């Protein structure tokens, strides 16, 4: 398990042994064997090299051995298969020297002997293997418990570490061996007899490699490879089991890292990364522990047996060797003995080489060493005994090997129990070291304890001459290695020659391929250049695209701003448009109203112009009418005066009065002077005719006299003093009659024009004259024979006369009486035209309703004035007007009423005409202003 991995929870720190501590025990065991039994250690290394022989038919270079590769995770029983080898394949090629000829003969004999041995032992080895397989089953359950704790891990480095569980390790104590001091020996010759000549050649090659390594220890610093060596121990207190225990021992190898021997994949339960420094070799070696089962009762050192290579003859079906093929202990023990016997036979076949080896080994021998023959016989005896025990019992293998030093020094054999205790202690300490690898303080403590234990073992580790003995024993193998090297050189030369001959026809193809390769390389370079150009262009285009994207972003922001401004402006424009539309609609409505008003105003102006022209025409016609009325009134008065013969001549007008009146008129001229003067002249010219007629009717003068006698007392007290004699009354009557005639004609024309429905009837604004004359008109009481309107006027005059002065009533009554007295005179004297004209005037006056109200207002306004102006007629002149009109209507008019005509009456008449003109001008002005306003 790697140092970084989690530590199992079941692991507890103990100072004395564990229930499952096999890997630590094997590690300490191999470490102890290195220093306590150097000769046995070297022998184990030799056997391990023999086990890891090369495959048949493989060309082996000097000093290098390719390792066999096994598939990971595959477990199975590999039945031993013996290949039939050609004898010539193991023999060196003939050379010119005689030594090579002798070597070839010796090799042929050795190969034939080994073939016979292998053929004879095929059946026996297979039987032993079957027994072994049956006996190995009871311990598989124990193996499973130890192997389930950790996953497989493959260490790819050259220096590898492997933990071998020792559950199947058999510890056999020295007390349970034979009970004597003579140790059983393994026979290398018997062991070598079990192997083929190819394995023998591999053994010789590896020995040569180890010797060359030992000769160059001072120049090398580290190992190039690792060999796993198995130790087989004896245990007296336990039952024999068919599995042999496997330990690990470090050994140096010259195999390169490219071709490691036996790359092992293990189910590691405990793994250590500590490197053990071996002072004897001055070389750092890493320990690789294999996962193998052990027997946990007691620990004793034993003899090591090498782990075979993957192509070894037989492989045990055991769990501790999942990735390496091994030989079962029952098969391995006799085969190692046969191998030793084969080694002795081979050395006997080479006397010359043996002498050379003897002469070489004498330089390294010491007097205390044993001979190689004695070692071989001892090992052969031990191998035979182990083979018999394996075949008879089939359960355990008692392998107790001692070297020459242990045979001479019995005291070292007695100290085995003490060393076992130290080994157990070292095992526990190393287990603690592995468990606490990541903790610095604990690691330091455990390392110090391990060093203390190793210092206790240093007393038994001092045998430098063991390697010299091994070198003497392996001298024939070195000579064999030299022969194999020569054969290898020859084979390599042949191979090179074959390669040269085969290169001929392939040169053209090679040349074509090279040219094609060059062209393809050129094309590749060009394509790379074009690709670089395209990449540069692509980068430029990407930059341009990025710039365009940035510009597009800017433009999009600008467009958004513009759109927002346009939208805002559009909204404002819509608002303005709606407001303008509303204003335009209002303006159109106002325009329509104004047009309608203008049309109405134009129509009204047209109507007003028409009415104005009508008024002008009416005014002109009224003026003509006034003139005609004046003339007709003068004619009427003259006619009436001719009928009245009862008037007094004393009251008639004289020339002197007219002269006085002319003088007054000259002082105050008036526009109506000419008409009045003509009127007076007519009266004066007709006076003589009137006077002649009045003389014939004296009886009719009585009512006039009565009226004249009544009129002076009925005048108001504020009347003018100049009119006390009655002359002012006649002047007022004449002036009022003229004004009445003008106003009546104007009103009559308006009423006549009012018959049209479409035309507008306008009431004249000149109400001053109507105010003056309306009381006069309403006070009139004409005859019922004249018209119905006259009767209405008479009835209305009673109501309107109530607001005026009551002293008028006697005059009215007298006038009525006079009218009643003289109906016949009027009918005889009136002209028909004058009668019709008077009727029209009376009807027109009767159709003006507001005349009475304005007369009341004017009467109240002018009443209090005690000093009336000369242009305004006083109230006292109104009563003679009514009497004058009544006398106009009646036939009893007297000419004496005109005898009182003075300048004051003329002034009133002139003022009335001026007021009429002013009223007409005001009417025209008001019409013009009204048109302008509209």
UniProtKB/Swiss-Prot annotation:
Pfam families: CCDC14
GO CC annotation terms, alphabetical: centriolar satellite; ciliary basal body; cytoplasm
Keywords: Coiled coil, Cytoplasm, Cytoskeleton, Phosphoprotein
Disulfide partners: none
Presence of keyword Coiled coil: yes
Top-rank taxon, per record: Eukaryota
Cytoplasm keyword on record: yes
Coiled-coil segments: 432-606
Region (Disordered): 1-22, 55-75, 128-156, 708-740, 793-829, 852-877
UniProt xrefs under InterPro entries: CCDC14
Protein's cellular compartments: Cytoplasm, Cytoskeleton, Microtubule organizing center, Centrosome, Centriolar satellite
Oligomer status and interactors: Interacts with CEP63.
The protein's role, per its UniProt record: Negatively regulates centriole duplication. Negatively regulates CEP63 and CDK2 centrosomal localization.
PANTHER family: COILED-COIL DOMAIN-CONTAINING PROTEIN 14
Protein name as annotated: Coiled-coil domain-containing protein 14
Native species: Mus musculus (Mouse)
Record lineage: Eukaryota, Metazoa, Chordata, Craniata, Vertebrata
